[in-house]
Structure formats: structure tokens, C-alpha cells
Amino acid sequence: DELAGIPGRINLLNAQLIECVPVNFVRGLTFNDSIVIVDEAQNLTKSELVTILTRFGANSKFVVIGDSNQSDINGKSGFGPIYNCFNNKSSEREGIFTFKFTGKDIVRSEILKFIVKKLEGV
């Protein structure tokens, strides 16, 4: 809603240019000619992430976004292991890239930079 506003989001959904699919409903799908954004991936189990990633079809891009420090599924997150699995040169040769943001990348607010830095040591 920040980028397109609510009317813009509704128009994109109605035009079927974007689609929101809960993880429970991706089984059996193949994402061809798509850009798939998986947000809050730290709250998905390894099994759920595997289910999503194995829907990868032709001419598609997947963007998986997560913060291991913000998982709320009590140690069951699959995000860290999946990230580490693809954080290497062989994955890069296949066109799979990973990166991490640091505290310097925070743009939400200056106070948040301070808070995140303090929380790193907790």
C-alpha cells in the first residue's frame, strides 16, 4: 500500500497483475513467467520454504526476504538453513544470489538504527 496505495493495489489485483497466495495453497502450482516475493520467510519452516521454492518454473525470479532475528516460530524457522544452503559460489553460478542487510541499511528511522545495534548484543 505504501507504493501503489490501496486503490492501486486493488487495481493490480483486479487486473490479475499481482496475486497473493498463502503457503498452504501453493502445492501443485508452477510459477512460470513470474516474479515471486516470499516475505517474512523467517516465519516459515524448512518444509514450507521447500514447498514454495520447488514451484519454480520457467522464466521466473524468486525473492525470499527474511530476518532470522525476528522469527516467531520458536526455533522452527527454515530460513537460516535455506539461506545458508544457497549462500555460495555454486549457487551464484546458477544465478542464485544472496545478501544481507546491515544496520547501516536501515532507513525506517534513526532511532531504529540505535535500537538494532543495542539488540545485537542481547
Question: Model-derived features: where do they sit?
Answer:
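Conserved helicase motor core of SF1/SF2 NTP-dependent helicases
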Residues: 1-38, 42-122
